[in-house]
Amino acid sequence: METFANLEPEELVGWAFPCECGKTHRTALRALQIAPGALASLPAMLKTVNANRPFVLWDENTREAVGESARNALRIYPSFCYPAEPRPLPNERCLGQAVAAFDPACDLILAVGSGVLNDLAKMLGRVSGRPTGVVATAPSMDGYASNSAAMELSGVKTSVYTPAPVLVLGDVEVLKNAPEAMLRSGLGDMLAKETALCEWRVAALATGEAYCENVAALMRSALDRTVSSADGLLKRDGRAVQNVTEGLVVSGIAMGYSDTSRPASGTEHTLSHLWEMLALARGGRPAPHGLQVGLATRYMLRLYRDVAALAPTPARSREAYAAFRQEQWEAELRQVFGAQAEPMIAAALREGRNQPEPQSARAARALANWPAIRREIEASAARADQLIALMDAAGLPRHPGELNLSEADAKLAFHHSRDLRSRYLLTSLLWDLGELEPMEERYANLL
C-alpha cells in the first residue's frame, strides 16, 4: 500500500486507507482548509458538508478575533456566546448553557475558537446528534480534527469519544494574530508528539496494544514539519503558523485514523491533565494546555535518558509488587484527589490493573522485549537536546512555578500518572518493572 504519511492535510480527508495494521483508516472530516484568507471559503465549505443552518458556539474573544466580515456573516445563524470572563470551561455547567440555547432546527454545530469551545461543540454534537465543525482562531492545541473531547466531568479530566468534525477551517491571517501564549501552547503540544509516539510503540511492545507504523509515520511527518517551522512561529510568519496549525490538525486526523489519542498523547498529556485537576480542585485556573504539555515533555525527554540506562530484572519487579498494598493505594488516592479518586479507583478495579496476574504478565512481556523498548526510548532521548532548545528559544516554561504549580504538584502528578486512566504509560511500565520509585527521585531532581 502506498503510504499516506507524506500527503498534504487536505489529501487525508474523504478517503479510506486499507492498511497493513488490519484497520481501514478514515476520518469523518470532509472539508479542510488552512490558508491565508480561508474565511472567505466558509460558505462554500458549509455547502460541502450540507450545512444550511449551523448553530454557532463562540465567546466574546473569538467572536472578535475572526473579524467583522466573518462576524457579520455568522450572526445570521442561531448562536450562543460565552462571556470573555469568566472564560468557558469544558465542564457540565458550560455544556449545559450551550444545550439550553441550542436551536434543534440547526443541522451543524460550528465552534469558533480553539480548545475549550471545540470540545464543548463536540459534546453538544454528541448529545444532539448533529455533526460539528470548527473555525480555528489559534494554533494552540491538537484537538481540532480529533474524535474526542477533553472534558472535566465530576472534576476528573476525561477524554470523551465523539464523532470527528466534518469541517475544519483555519484562516492564517486570524491564526497568526492569536495571543503569544497560544502560539507557544501549540508548539508545546506538537513537540509532545515525540514522547507520545515513543510511548505508543513502547506500550505495543510491553502489552501487545494495537500499533500502526503508517499512522505513526504520519504523526512523525507532522512533528518534523513543526520542528522546521518553530523559529518562525513567534515571529508570526504566515508559513510557519500554517505549518504548525496543519501539524495540529494532522494530529487529530491521526487520532481518528487509529481510533485512539495514542499517536498524540502519552505521559506528558496525563501530567497536564492531573495538573489541571489539581488547579480546578483548588478553585484556580489551569495554565494553557499546550504550555503544561510542553513543560511535561521537557521533563519526560530528560528522564528518558535515565530510563534507557535501566537494567530491569524479574526479581526487582517481584520485590516491588510484593510491597504494594491495594488498600493503601486507594487511601492515598482519596487523600490527594478526594471524590475525584472514586472513578479512578473503580476503573482500576474493573480492569484488574493492580492485580498480581496482569502485573506479572505485563512485566514478563516487557522484560522479554526490553532491548527493543530501550531502543525506542534511546531514539527519543537522542532528540531531547534539539527539542528542548526549540522550547527554550520559544520561551516555553522551564519550571513548575511559571505555570502556578508547585514542585510538590509536579511530583504528585508523576507519582499518580498511571492511576488516572487505563492507558499504558511510561510510568505504568516503570511500575510493572519495579522501577517507578527510583525514577521518581530522578524526576524530582529535574524540577
PLM region descriptions:
Residues P104-L124, S128-A138:
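A short, small-residue-rich loop immediately preceding and capping a beta-strand
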Residues M1-L108:
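ATP/NTP phosphate-donor binding region
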Residues T24-R26, V49, A101-P104, G125, ...:
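Solvent-exposed alpha-helices and their adjacent loops that cap or buttress functional pockets
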Residues L57-W58, G113, G170:
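Short beta-strand/turn micro-motifs composed of small residues
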Residues E2-C19, L310-L447:
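C-terminal charged capping/lid subdomain of soluble metabolic enzymes
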